[in-house]
Amino acid sequence: LGSFRLEDVTPGQWEVQVAALGYAAYTEVLEVGVTQVVELDIRLERSALILEGIEVEAERSRDRVRFEELGGATVRELDLDEIRVVPGVAEPDPVRAIEVLPGVVSTSDFSAAFHVRGGSQDQNLILLDGVPIFSPFHLGGLFSVFNADMIDRVELLSGGFAAEHGGRVSSVLEIESDAGTGEFSGDAAISLLSSRVAVGGRLPDAVARSLGYANIRYRLSARRSYFDVLFKPAFEFPYHLTDLQTVVEGWTPSGDRLTVTAYTGRDVFDLTQIEDGGFPFRIDWNWGNDAMGVRWSRARRGGGSLDIRANASSYDNGLLFPDFGDTDFSSDIQQAQIRADLDTRPTRYWGVQVGSSVERMEYETSFSTGGTTFGGGDSHGWLFGNYAQARYSLPRRWLVELGVRADAYNPAVGNVVFEPSPRVALKRFYRNGDLAAKVAAGRYTQFVHSLRDEELPLGLDIWIISDENVPHTVSDQVQFGLEGWHDIDWFWSIEGYYRSFNGVVTFNTADNPNDPTDDILGGRGTSWGADVMIRKETGEVNGWLAVSFLKAQRKFPDLLSPLTPAPEVMYPPIFDRRVDLDFVMSYPGPWGWTGGLRWNLGTGIPYTRAIGSHAYYSPRYVGGGGLDWTGDGDSSGTRGYGVVLADRNSTRYPLYHRLDVSFRRSFSKGWGALTPYVNLVNVYNQRNVLFYFYQYEEDPPVRSGISMFPVLPTLGLEISF
């Protein structure tokens, strides 16, 4: 499936030859007139080729192609080999791996949630083959739901993305599934965390033809943790996770492509099976995602394509406390979308892309105890998006991108919101196309939010959508920088940026329990900084250095203040890591082993420090009309301690740094390959602080810290056949 266009052809007789590996050569003689436009449809017939040998000397870097063809967008890619090289906990993780890219901040070893250039984690649009995934994390955020064996590549757009992308304001993470080659194959693995398997192949040609396709290939995978099964004879292990994912790709004889992607996954943490007297705090916590998408693509004559997509996605979680009057909390969100995108190439220098989408979003939250519902809410809304963008390219000289996106949001409660979002990018090439200066600016909008307590290392996402009581987010952004290549091996870039956020939300600590409309508080924010990257693309030793500088702020009204109007409180959010450095390297080891190394250094993230405490006392009336100060029965008469806090997030944890290494080796067998691997997290056992707690009974109070991962060795085995 492809296209070509030849212009300024001298009139006369021409012989056209087309050849492709695995197909018979095609030859045709054409007569071209002075003003004649000749259209030619070519269909190659399959033909086996007998070759003495093929030597592949080099392949064109995808990073080089993006450098030449993208204007202002900041795009970083990791392929499967790079994902596997980055050391991790237990097994390769596509989402964990992007933490090593510039502009990406992670706040904890225990959370795979990421923050890009001063945006919160819910401001990242995460797409699996174009299907949005709301909360793609297992075990409270410890690692992601994506099976690395099903992934072809991961692409992060951390800024300056074009008008075709809407719905989030911070970044776009595109995860592309691998449909396989059509040959029957499989991958299986077992780690300390889970076991997984993925198989792929193609339907028989007769079956494919009966469905109207030239060929249909597929790949499906399953993953499950196994501790609950392993320990079941001895005791009930309370946790397990499951993932199921599939991708099916069909090609019609005319070259159209139909792709179907589906995913379902769930976590279950069940302590309700323990007898009442055996455990004082029983809970039943389960959460998961479901997603499905269909995409039809047709290549157009002269270049470009037409894509029509439909998808649906949902996320839900529930938390039950049976020992507290069956206290139950639940939250879920659903979305369904239909969209069409048309890409055309009217001339050799110009490209035009237009698209439209219709999306319905719905959420519901509830809180009940003792059979009575005390809180919660639900709402729905329709989002209509349209965009148009034009691209002018003068190879090795100029790249200009102009676009506009228009979003119309119709909530169930409130008025229709219309947000135009202009976007522009300019790129100028120098030094024969090896150096480029670029600038991009645009507006981005978002109508969905996730609420979570930023102080909790294991988060529980509560998704809500905008309405008359919940503002939508508007972010104006500008970025500029230089990037270039040195030979074919080295790529470097430096970018600065500024972002404003209007309509960020948080819980309202001063809400009126009798007023259901004041649960959410809207505010503003800013972020600015710079990202630097140096990357070696080829050779046995390769890798990159990424350095990020960031300053982020949030501003909300202080409704607890007695002043009118309420003063505003400005503070750095928890993901305001001022300096973040990542060094990643892949290198050959002895005896055929391949080593991977990651060293991460970051300044401390902010927290709210306790600066004092005081005892609580309570009066008791006694006989004779007097007062007696009493407490919990001891001589002090205290009833606990109150804590005096400093300004919000005005103190920072100590410097964070950690070294991780990995080792892999493949052993080829007649039927496939065995690949054992070892990961060693936090090699020198750095005690990075997760949070502090205080013992106020001591005088003076004693501060203690809870650390993140200690030195943590893990191993696993991968099988390919």
Show the residue positions of the predicted features.
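Periplasmic N-terminal accessory/gating domains of Gram-negative outer-membrane beta-barrel systems
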Residues: 24, 30-39, 43, 52-162, ...
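Transmembrane beta-barrel wall of Gram-negative outer-membrane proteins
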Residues: 187, 193-226, 235-268, 283-307, ...
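Surface-exposed extracellular loop regions of Gram-negative outer-membrane beta-barrel proteins
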Residues: 266-268, 362-367, 426-477, 498-519, ...
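Outer-membrane beta-barrel signature, preferentially recognizing the C-terminal barrel domain
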Residues: 277-296, 379, 443-493, 498-501, ...
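Gram-negative outer-membrane beta-barrel transporters
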Residues: 394-400, 497-500, 520-609
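C-terminal beta-signal and adjacent terminal beta-strands/loops
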Residues: 592, 600-640, 652-660, 664-721
